Structures are given as C-alpha cells and as structure tokens.
Amino acid sequence: IVQSICEGGDDGAPAATKVDSITGQVYNILMVFIKIIGVIFLLHIFLLVFQYTIAALFVHRNPFKLLGKMMPAYFTALGTQSSAATIPVTLRQTVKNGVTEDIAGFVIPLCATIHLSGSTLKIVACALALMIMQGMPFDFPMFAGFIFMLGITMVAAPGVPGGAIMAALGILASMLGFGESEQALMIALYIAMDSFGTACNVTGDGAIALIIDKFFGKKDLRPIQ
C-alpha cells in the first residue's frame, strides 16, 4: 500500500510530494490554531482579573485573594466543561468569599445559564482570526452588531460542553457569512479550548455574586472563611 501511494498520483506527480505538501499545510494551520488558543487563554486571564478588580472596588477587598478562592471552581470546570455541573463547587467557593447564602444560591445557578463571558470572548476571537486567515471582509460595524447579537444568543445557550458554539452557528452564518467549512472550523477551535471558556464563565460568576451581594445581601456576623 505504501509503495502504491509513493509511486504517484493521478497527474503523475509523486504522491509522497503531495503528502508532504498536505502535511506542511496542516502543520501551519495547527501552529496558527495553537497561537489563537494561547492568545484567548491570556484574554481569559485578563477578563477574570478585570471582573474581580471591579468587584473588589465594591467590596473593598483584595481582588487577587477573591479570585484565588474561586480557583477550585476554575479547575473543576476545566474537567467538567460544564457550567451546570460545576454549580456546587462555584456556590461553595462564592460563599467562602463572603457572599450570603441566599444571594449565592440565586446568582450562581442563574449565571451558570446566562453569564457566558468566556465563551463569548472565545467565539468572537476565533471568528475574527478565521476571517483574517480566510481573507474574508469585515469591519467594525459588522462585528459590533455580531457581538450584540451574540450576547443575546448566549443567554439562551445551554451550560453544557459545546452549547455556546452550537447556539452561535446561526448568527455566524447570517451575520458573518460563514459557510459549512468555516462553521466546522469554528466548532473544532471552540471544542479544543472549551474547558478554558467554561472555567472563565464560572469563575466570573463569583465576581457578579460579590457585586449583587453588596447591594442586596443581608450581612451576618459570621467570619469569612
């Protein structure tokens, strides 16, 4: 079989040369994808630091200590890839951050469904990178409208592995002009780093709970663990 492959293709060119060419293209694409994943991971870190910095301004506490207490939820989400499955851990760590149980019990399950900031960031970044790679035209108004509609769509996206990208396929096609091949690449890119997006989502839920608790929580005298 190997000999027949190496003897040549339909046009007489050595098949081994074709295989090398395809392998080189795949390698280049994979390198680009790895760079995209790295950039998005850094953006997720920046987003979490930003969210907890804002929350810290309301509660007057160290944002990095607040973020550090949410790390069990972050690492649990890396494994489950599901916001819904991580709710018990997220809820426990949010209470440890000083949020009252009533507020945490309301905000965390709700945000597991409607707060998908990490997934939204990831979809926008992947879509932009793919359009640049494919030479597709784009401009700021197009992406502004896409981000607005994506934010609404993410409210309806299920908190399960791959739920966000599947919910976003419609607007990727209608607003950005993605065909079947582009949508397939988006799904592949998204699934490859789904765990990081989910971890960003659930960890950010704790920051929202802190802000809501500041305004509506009934504080008790229990020490913060």
Each language-model region and where it sits:
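Signature of multi-pass transmembrane helix bundles
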Residues: I1-K65, Q225
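Membrane-water interface at transmembrane helix exits
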Residues: V2-C6, Q51, A55-V59, V95, ...
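Juxtamembrane loop-helix boundary motifs flanking transmembrane segments in multi-pass membrane proteins
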Residues: D10-I29, V59-N62, L66, S82, ...
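Membrane-water interface of transmembrane alpha-helices in multipass transporters/channels
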Residues: N28-I34, V59-M71, M136-G145, F178-L185
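Membrane-spanning helices that line or support transport/gating and their immediate boundary helices
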Residues: I29, V49-L57, K65-L66, M70, ...
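Alpha-helical transmembrane segments of multipass membrane proteins
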Residues: L43-L47, Q51, H115, K122, ...
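Helix-loop-helix junctions within the multi-pass membrane cores of secondary transporters/permeases
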Residues: P72-M154, A209, R222-P223
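Transmembrane alpha-helical segments and their short flanking loops
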Residues: V124-Q225
